[in-house]
Design a protein with these regions (language model features):
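N-terminal cap/lid segment of alpha/beta-hydrolase-fold proteins
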Residues: 4-45, 302
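Short beta-strand element of the alpha/beta-hydrolase
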Residues: 49-58
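Conserved alpha/beta-hydrolase
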Residues: 61-64, 72-96
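Alpha/beta-hydrolase-fold enzymes
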Residues: 122-229
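Catalytic histidine-centered segment of alpha/beta-hydrolase-like enzymes
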Residues: 288-310
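Catalytic nucleophile-loop/oxyanion-hole region of alpha/beta-hydrolase
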Residues: 74, 88-126
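Active-site nucleophile elbow and catalytic-triad environment of alpha/beta-hydrolase enzymes
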Residues: 224-247, 253
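Short beta-strand/loop motif that positions the catalytic acidic residue
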Residues: 251, 257-259, 263
């Protein structure tokens, strides 16, 4: 598939979820906001030096999403200990915090990692973030590097991988309001509207903001729902605080950012404005769309011939599971 739109659309329809063992659920307190949920799976035989990997999902997804489960499956097969986060308000975390799913929750993710590092005896982490989760990961790494006193890490990060991160959140919201890309706005708004109604059935804070809810665009949704619930005075303030584009030059751990030149949601040109640190590698692909990367296996591949394969899921798992990342980052 050579069209970024086709890659993105088909990925939205082709959702094979990997079957994983029942996870252990960690309920992590996040102060006055309640708790976040982290879902842990371990391989059948866990080595003492097995890498611990955190996975962060994108907007409208959760720990149970297609790429989250498929990447986790690949990591487990490679002997890794896997932790899939539900960002605040996403998936089952909607039951434990009134916060909305949002792209400025990097400090809450840091708190979760600190807690897990202490309770589980984990000294070092590898992490991957997909789409909005990728921006959250980059922002967390950068803010720690800028101000380790305010944003302390009680752990080391051996390696980070960010896929299709909306590093300029305002620009990405404006981008999906142009032309045919409005279809993506309709897709996200449909999911967000459904989530909002579910949240309002649980939390009075949601019932209050929904009185003035505006669902016409993602920006209007963020202005009337996300920003006030997340503690920001406006969508612009939320985007400014959450976007990682101005902080990327400060990241001091080995980091790969994977983007596609034909991503219809996160435009590649925003990365031309970014300044990257010496430890960051930007990888540009062609025709992958927004976290798509689908291709058909040749008919000659036996029973699998002609089937779609999700290239990125396996590639991300293989990259995160590489040996000796700790030595490379030291």
């Amino acid at each position: 598939l050579r069209s970024g739109h086709l890659q993105t659309w088909i990925t939205g329809l082709y959702r094979p979820v990997a079957q994983l063992p029942t996870p252990r659920i960690h309920r992590i307190p996040i102060g006055e906001y309640g708790a976040m949920l982290i879902h842990e799976n371990v391989p059948e035989s866990l080595a003492s030096d097995a890498p611990s990997v955190l996975l962060l999902h994108g907007l409208g997804s959760s720990h149970a999403g297609t790429y989250m489960t498929n990447i986790a499956s690949g990591l487990l097969a490679r002997g890794c200990r896997v932790f899939r986060a539900d960002l605040p308000g996403a998936g089952p975390s909607s039951q434990t915090t009134h916060l909305p799913p949002h792209g400025a929750c990097f400090d809450l993710v840091r708190i979760c990692l600190n807690t897990l590092s202490h309770t589980q005896g984990i000294r070092s982490w590898r992490a991957a973030g997909i789409s909005l989760g990728g921006n959250v990961l980059l922002k967390m790494l950068a803010r720690h590097a800028i101000d380790p006193t305010k944003y302390p890490f009680d752990f080391e990060v051996d390696y980070a991988l960010s896929v299709a991160p909306p590093i300029d959140m305002k620009e990405c919201c404006e981008n999906v309001e142009r032309g045919i890309k409005r279809l993506y706005t309709h897709y996200f708004i449909r999911i967000l509207k459904m989530q909002a109604r579910q949240q309002a059935s649980i939390w009075p804070q949601w019932r209050e903001v929904l009185r003035n809810a505006d669902y016409r665009t993602i920006r209007r949704f963020d202005e009337t729902i996300t920003a006030p619930l997340a503690g920001f005075p406006s969508a612009d303030a939320y985007y400014q605080f959450g976007s990682s584009i101005d902080d990327l030059k400060n990241i001091d751990v080995p980091t790969t950012i994977l983007i596609d030149e034909h991503d219809p949601i996160v435009p590649a040109h925003i990365f031309d404005r970014a300044v990257f640190s010496a430890t960051t590698r930007l990888v540009r692909t062609q025709h992958g769309g927004h976290v798509g990367y689908l291709h058909r296996l040749p008919i000659s591949d036996g029973k699998a011939g002609g089937r779609w394969q999700r290239w990125a899921d396996n590639t991300i798992a293989a990259e995160l599971a590489k040996p000796n990342w700790s030595q490379r980052s030291g």
